[in-house]
Amino acid sequence: MEDSLKQLSLGRDPEGAGDSQALAELQELALKWFMETQAPFILQNGALPPWFHGFITRKQTEQLLRDKALGSFLIRLSDRATGYILSYRGSDRCRHFVINQLRNRRYIISGDTQSHSTLAELVHHYQEAQLEPFKEMLTAACPRPEDNDLYDAITRGLHQTIVDPENPPATAFLTVVPDKAASPRSSPKPQVSFLHAQKSLDVSPRNLSQEESMEAPIRVSPLPEKSSSLLEESFGGPSDIIYADLRRMNQARLGLGTEGSGRHGPVPAGSQAYSPGREAQRRLSDGEQNRPDGLGPVLSGVSPDQGPTESPTSWGCSDAMGSLGATWRQEFPKLSQEAQPCSQGSSADIYEFIGTEGLLQEARDTPDQEGSTYEQIPACWGGPARAPHPGASPTYSPWVHGYKRISGTPELSEPGNTYEQIPATKSKETGRTHKPDKLRRLFFTYRKHKF
């Protein structure tokens, strides 16, 4: 009995009591006072009454009585002094009254005039009489939460499941229910984890019927394995033609790399395979931005000193609606002996973008569709244009274009400059007004009229 009283009183220390030495000493004195003078009078048939909760704080008391019916009450030990406190659920909030013990060992509520011989008699009195000045009465005792019983039941159930595999695992869940009726306000506690239940199902499968053994284990479908290549599985519609053409071009370029390098020399870094649609749009836009008005597109990617840096003969292009992947093929006729960008001071040549029906028919009749989509460019514009590799035949395209030189184009002073140079003598005409002076006069005239 003494051990149960100590567990009840010291098991619920007030919040922050462990940090304060004074509160700890006060609780020790209150516990000694309760054990020596109060316990024999409170015990009913060797057990504590359901309305006595021992050491609990005001905050914990209000949490217990928050959702209880009007008039639900409990008696607790004060955590600030040696005495009792009556707490009950009022009409608008929880109310707390101090219970004092007189010299004649009788109990009285502070502020009241009627005393009682025991706490049980005091509780019975206020269940029939009203508490002044609130005109409220006590109804039912708020039971203590049976936390220890619940934990003991869970522990016994787990121990029985692991140690005695002969018993069915359902006993672990049946023993969770405590023997005594637990309080509705008992705090939720962790139940038996799924891991222990799964282990118990695996240990004793012979005690279950065939249907139960099939329903008991819950199996989760494995996650799908991720693909190592996005280009192989991610695209299954018509739009994957772009990637198929790109892989075919890479295979053809790798297969013919050794023979092509022996005949034509090292291929420039810019002539490698690119994304067909994006690279074609970039190159066409660059060519249109660099050309002057009235002239065809200037050959992009050509350096006057180093020759071609990228291969402009084949620009990959894919139809956006899912049609067959096609490339653009451009043909260069033999260049004039005068236009040699490899020599210093020579003028850049300008070409016109024209369509050739013969090339279209020739490309459509070409049987080989697995070849490379790029052609080798001669290292110097002055040399004869080499034919593409025999094994490399471009795929057909609805539009196949070439370039031809425009006759009568005046040579420019600089190789990379496509604009006409204006002689310096024209800027020194006598009848022309100097631009800074003209702007200065207009500015002062504007300010004069404004103010």
Curated annotation (Swiss-Prot):
GO cellular component terms, semicolon-separated: cytoplasm
Segments of skewed composition (Low complexity): 221-232
Keywords (A to Z) from UniProt: SH2 domain
Biased composition (Polar residues): 306-316
Record keyword Amino-acid biosynthesis present: no
Stretches for region Disordered: 180-232, 256-321, 408-436
Highest taxon in the source lineage: Eukaryota
Segments forming domain SH2: 51-142
Disulphide bridges: none
Any Pfam family hit: SH2
Biased composition (Basic and acidic residues): 279-291, 426-436
Name of the featured protein: SH2 domain-containing protein 7
Gene that produces this protein: SH2D7
